[in-house]
């Protein structure tokens, strides 16, 4: 930049010197400007006006005089003077330029060196100041950076803690959401199940109401029948008394006649026929004696003269079966007392219960088998055969004992094992806090309350399903199916 300034000043000085020299040499000549360009410099000259030139008014106005040539010698002389002057000035300017270039180089170098030294000192001072300021700014920036780093580290730690806490909370939220979804699913399932149970309960309540109405009708009919039977019983009792009196009179008459006819015979000979009467303990003995027809036979309690009427099945599986229970038409009410189940009730040729006491005494004399024959309302039949069966005495509530199940009415025994005590409506010996005999009706070997009850309420066809208190054998038809008919019969194991 200093070189450019210096060169500009030099050009101005040269131009000024040339101008002054030319003006001094041209003082006597008229002034006219003439500019010359040389290199980077431009020169302006003031040229004199010629006195020998004529004025426009001195010319002849006609065309011949205007086209006539001027004075040639005078013009040539003036041009030569001007050329000489121009040549001298040019030579002088060239010398001046060379002088300026030779002499000004040293000064320009010195000026450049001085400018560089001054600039260097200034720049060094400026650089020193800048370095000091930079160092101060760097120190401040270092402090700020350390503070920022500490603050950033603290924020990163807080952010990490918040992130861990957030992850933990998110995990807890996910777990709680999953648990809520599970609970919602379970709640939906339970609600659906409750609705289904409500529907089932409504159906069952309707069915129970219908059963209740039917039972009320049946009870009314049975009450009428009972009243009629009571009347018939009174009549039969009266007739029986008359018949017994007549029989007694006839026996006395016969005895008198026998005494009159054979006065020599002793009383022992009179009752020979009675002493020769055959005693049967069960239907197997009846069968072995040659009586092989189904029917009612008189059996005698073991070690006793007490007799009982029993139905003997002489055809099923070889015969010799003593029937201890039969259900076929619902004509007999099996909701009886303990005493009635002990001695038996019903008609041996139809629905009846033979009696727990007789079965206990018979089955404790020798090993017996128990066969249970079942019928459903669709015409199907099945059976369960227990290879060993006996009852305990009344002191043990006629507890049942069974072993060795075979048959087609289920692979599992529907009579719970080990043996259960017998229960009736007035003797609750089951294993339930409820009273199974009252709930399910009938006397049976209830557990709590167990999968079977062949002495339950008798239901006719199309009313025999969904009955919890009917005649049931769970492992053949389920708990809600009431059977059409059942037969329980016993026979010695060695028959």
From Swiss-Prot:
Keyword field contains Metal-binding: yes
Coiled coil regions, renumbered to chain: 165-247
SMART domains xref list: FBG
Stored Gene3D superfamilies: Gamma Fibrinogen, chain A, domain 1, Gamma-fibrinogen Carboxyl Terminal Fragment, domain 2
Function: Binds to TEK/TIE2, competing for the ANGPT1 binding site, and modulating ANGPT1 signaling. Can induce tyrosine phosphorylation of TEK/TIE2 in the absence of ANGPT1. In the absence of angiogenic inducers, such as VEGF, ANGPT2-mediated loosening of cell-matrix contacts may induce endothelial cell apoptosis with consequent vascular regression. In concert with VEGF, it may facilitate endothelial cell migration and proliferation, thus serving as a permissive angiogenic signal. Involved in the regulation of lymphangiogenesis.
Record remark: domains: The Fibrinogen C-terminal domain mediates interaction with the TEK/TIE2 receptor.
Protein name per Swiss-Prot or TrEMBL: Angiopoietin-2
Protein's gene: ANGPT2
């Amino acid at each position: 930049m200093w070189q450019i300034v210096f060169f500009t000043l030099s050009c101005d000085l040269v131009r000024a010197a040339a101008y002054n020299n030319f003006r001094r040499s041209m003082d006597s000549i008229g002034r006219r400007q003439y500019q010359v360009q040389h290199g980077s410099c431009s020169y302006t000259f003031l040229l004199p006006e010629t006195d020998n030139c004529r004025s426009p008014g001195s010319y002849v106005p006609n065309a011949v005089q205007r086209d006539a040539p001027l004075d040639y010698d005078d013009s040539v002389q003036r041009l030569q003077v001007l050329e000489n002057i121009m040549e001298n000035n040019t030579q002088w300017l060239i010398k001046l330029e060379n002088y300026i270039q030779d002499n000004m180089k040293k000064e320009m170098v010195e000026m450049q060196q001085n400018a560089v030294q001054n600039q260097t000192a200034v720049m060094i001072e400026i650089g020193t100041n800048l370095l000091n300021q930079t160092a101060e700014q760097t120190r401040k920036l270092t402090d700020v950076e350390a503070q920022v780093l500490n603050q950033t580290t603290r924020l990163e730690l807080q952010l990490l803690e918040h992130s861990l806490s957030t992850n933990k909370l998110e995990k807890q939220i996910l777990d709680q959401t999953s648990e809520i979804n599970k609970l919602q699913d379970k709640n939906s399932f339970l609600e659906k199940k409750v609705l289904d149970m409500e529907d089932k309960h409504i159906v069952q309540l309707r069915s129970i109401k219908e059963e209740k109405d039917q039972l009320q009708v049946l009870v009314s009919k049975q009450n009428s029948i009972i009243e009629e039977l009571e009347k018939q019983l009174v009549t039969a009792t009266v007739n029986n008394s008359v018949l017994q009196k007549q029989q007694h009179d006839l026996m006395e008459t016969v005895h008198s006649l026998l005494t009159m006819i054979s006065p020599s015979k002793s009383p022992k000979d009179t009752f020979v026929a009675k002493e020769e009467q055959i005693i049967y303990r069960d239907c197997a003995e009846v069968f072995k004696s040659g009586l092989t027809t189904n029917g009612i036979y008189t059996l005698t309690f073991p070690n006793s003269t007490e007799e009982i009427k029993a139905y003997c099945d002489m055809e099923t599986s070889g015969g010799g079966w003593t029937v201890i229970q039969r259900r076929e038409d619902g004509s007999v009410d099996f909701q009886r007392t303990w005493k009635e189940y002990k001695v038996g009730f019903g008609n041996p040729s139809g629905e009846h219960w033979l009696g727990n006491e007789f079965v206990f005494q018979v089955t404790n004399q020798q090993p017996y088998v128990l066969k249970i024959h079942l019928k459903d309302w669709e015409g199907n039949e099945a059976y369960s055969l227990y290879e060993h069966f006996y009852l305990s005495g009344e002191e043990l509530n006629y507890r049942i004992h069974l072993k060795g199940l075979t048959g087609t009415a289920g692979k599992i025994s529907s009579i719970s094992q080990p043996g259960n005590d017998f229960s009736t409506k007035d003797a609750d010996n089951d294993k339930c806090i409820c009273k199974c005999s009252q709930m399910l009706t009938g006397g049976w070997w209830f557990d709590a309350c167990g999968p079977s009850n062949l002495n339950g309420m008798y239901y006719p066809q199309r009313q025999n399903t969904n009955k919890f208190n009917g005649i049931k054998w769970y492992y053949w038809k389920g708990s809600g199916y009431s059977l059409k008919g059942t037969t329980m019969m016993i026979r010695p194991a060695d028959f």
